[in-house]
A protein has these predicted regions:
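Alpha-carbonic anhydrase
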Residues: 2-267
Length: 267
């Protein structure tokens, strides 16, 4: 038991010790582009039918990890192991709105300077985007939506923070994004005179799950540090419906946890 606790403590203090691999580096370019499929030069993919998640690996050799990978995301956050994971810090800043419909989601690109700190490592926020319904499950159940904040460290390591979105009051932070979100795929749109505050989309209670996973879209590259907050943020039912009108389903099904540790803070 002592050895196991030591292992968990080490995993919490050094959650991502490996540098960015070449496949993950290439995948990052695809993830941050106007269209993941176009930016990577890879095969077209989607969420239903012959292009759906169960077929991703067959669409292109670049997508092999979608089936062959052993540390895939999302997962069911069923029972985290209590661990001294330490605090997570955010220094996000309001900024001009840059929004894009990349054909798979609505994405907000972020200017340099907004940071997330995990232990001694700083990760710069690159973009955040949305999934309907939520990709991660919480004890087998999916929230209405999920927001992913994608970060990169100076060494090139990726870290994503996930926030569940559940029906409730109008989310004021989402109003300018929803008002400007393009109805069709296209280039990034800089919305004059409109600012967005990523910090306003974070939950007040910062209890979280942590594990090593992957990108949730092709090429499903692994080596991504995931932090998913337990408590959701509210948005109005009409805000959910507005997003769902554009993306009725853009969530990958839960993947096996396998031999990974799922850690939970604050317990």
């Amino acid at each position: 038991m002592l050895a196991r606790r030591s292992l968990l403590r080490s995993a919490a203090l050094c959650p991502l010790c490996a540098p960015l691999t070449a496949p993950l580096g290439a995948a990052l370019g695809a993830t941050l582009g106007a269209s993941a499929a176009r930016a990577s030069g890879g095969a077209h993919w989607g969420y239903e039918g012959a292009d759906g998640p169960e077929h991703w690996a067959a669409l292109s050799p670049e997508y092999r990890a979608c089936t062959a990978g052993t540390e895939q995301t999302p997962i069911d956050l069923a029972a985290g192991i209590p661990a001294q994971t330490g605090r997570i810090g955010f220094a996000y800043h309001p900024q001009p709105l840059q929004v894009v419909n990349n054909g798979h989601t609505i994405q907000v690109n972020v200017a340099p300077g907004s940071m997330m700190a995990i232990g001694e490592t700083g990760y710069e926020l690159l973009q955040f985007h949305f999934h309907h319904p939520a990709e991660h499950l919480l004890a087998g159940k999916a929230a209405a939506m999920e927001c992913h904040f994608v970060h990169r460290s100076p060494a090139g390591a990726l870290a994503v923070a996930g926030v569940f979105l559940q029906p409730g009051r109008v989310n004021a932070a989402l109003v300018p994004i929803w008002k400007a979100m393009p109805v069709a795929a296209g280039p990034v749109q800089a919305v004059a005179g409109v600012t967005v505050d990523p910090a306003a989309l974070l939950p007040r209670d910062r209890t979280y799950f942590r594990y090593m996973g992957s990108l949730t879209t092709p090429p499903c590259s692994e080596g991504v540090l995931w932090t998913v907050f337990r408590d959701p943020v509210a948005l109005a039912p009409e805000q959910i419906r507005a997003f769902a009108a554009l993306f009725p389903m853009n969530a990958r099904p839960a993947q096996p946890l396998g031999r990974r540790f799922l850690l939970e803070s604050g317990v």
